[in-house]
Structures are given as structure tokens and as C-alpha cells.
């Protein structure tokens, strides 16, 4: 089996995380997984949604979108259609769930964190790149809250979160699929993990042929290997 990119089966794409990418957001990152590029921002606003009022905890919510020409052919803006598509809703819920797992909301205070992930170029793995980049932006946003005198109850950050895709391509497990691989893969799996080794979410679909338990175990092992490298990259970016 030869991957279109020439990478080894267990090799990630080149990953870059650029912090403080935009001027106004409390946390902002440009994350690049190969040719997939996503701008992730975290905005801080006082107050919480109505369903959390009086409960003494904060909240985090996420939105996701793609520029019309992030892909090979132009896609109509969802705003011009008047509603978000099912894929968009699914992905932004995944991003929100994943990042909430990083936080102790009771220590966040009366604050809502708005995570915005905007894909400027797509070549597979946009949701996993979004989670990975937004996590770094979230850490920076928490630092800003603390500088402003917030987080009186302590640090709400419990653990780092990252995500990566794995799949079965031509009968073999591969790590971090690009678009060519993703479109031809027999199985596509998105894995979200914590820096302590726990799983937050595993989303998997057999596109061409059913995958077997041994295949699943092999894909998860690949994801764990890749995640170790991604957490190192996140930490290196935050150390700059």
C-alpha cells in the first residue's frame, strides 16, 4: 500500500500551530495539518446562557464554518442559504463537547467562551484540526481571563485535548488522512483524546467494507501514537 502523499502509514502530516494569529480575540490560532488550514478563535463574554443562570458555573460553545472556496469548487455560504447544514451542526457540536471536557466549568466563573473555527483551506481532517488548534487558543484565552482578575476559584483547565483522524485505506490502517485518502478510505475514524490518555469521542463509519475488531484496535493504536506527537506540538506552541 502506497499513500498518495508518500507518507508512512503511521506518519502525521506536517503540523504547525501559530498563536496570536488575530488581533481582537482573547485566544487565536492558525492551525495547519498539511494543506488543511483553520483559524480558531476563543472569545470571552460575561454571563452564561439562561439554563445555567444561578448555577455558579461557566459555559463553552463552538461554531464551525468553511470559506466558500476552502474546497476545490466554491460552496455557497450557509448564511446565504438561511440555515446551517447537518454536517456543520454535527462538527460544531463535536468541537464544543470536546473542549468542554478540558475544563472544570465550576471554576470558570460567570463567563461564556465562544469558540469559532473557520476553515480557510480544506484537505481532509478539518474537524480534528479545529479541535487541536482551538485547544491552544482556549489556553491563551484562559490566561487573558486570569490577567483581567478572573478565575478566582482556581485554574479551570483539567487537561489538554487533541484530535486526529485514522482510517482503513486499501486494507491497511493509516494515520491523519488527507482528502484523497479520506474520499477513498474504506473506514474513516475521528478520535478525540485527553493528554492523560483518555478517549473523549470516537466517530467511525465504514464507507466501503465493514471493519473488524482487529481493524478498530489497530486504528485506535495509530491514533494514540499520533496523539502523543500532537500533544507535544501543542505544548511546544504554548511554550513559545
Curated annotation (Swiss-Prot):
The keyword Acyltransferase does not apply. It is an enzyme of class 2 (transferase). One of its GO terms (biological process) is rRNA catabolic process. InterPro entries: ExoRNase_PH_dom1 (IPR001247), ExoRNase_PH_dom2 (IPR015847), ExoRNase_PH_dom2_sf (IPR036345), PNPase/RNase_PH_dom_sf (IPR027408), Ribosomal_Su5_D2-typ_SF (IPR020568), RNase_PH (IPR050080), RNase_PH_bac-type (IPR002381), RNase_PH_CS (IPR018336). Its EC number is 2.7.7.56. Coiled coil: none annotated. GO terms for molecular function: 3'-5'-RNA exonuclease activity; tRNA binding; tRNA nucleotidyltransferase activity. It comes from the Bacteria. Phosphate binds at residues 87, 125-127. Pfam families: RNase_PH, RNase_PH_C. It catalyses: tRNA(n+1) + phosphate = tRNA(n) + a ribonucleoside 5'-diphosphate. Keywords: Nucleotidyltransferase, RNA-binding, rRNA processing, Transferase, tRNA processing, tRNA-binding. Phosphorolytic 3'-5' exoribonuclease that plays an important role in tRNA 3'-end maturation. Removes nucleotide residues following the 3'-CCA terminus of tRNAs; can also add nucleotides to the ends of RNA molecules by using nucleoside diphosphates as substrates, but this may not be physiologically important. Probably plays a role in initiation of 16S rRNA degradation (leading to ribosome degradation) during starvation. HAMAP family: RNase_PH (MF_00564). Homohexameric ring arranged as a trimer of dimers. Belongs to the RNase PH family. This is Ribonuclease PH. The gene is rph.
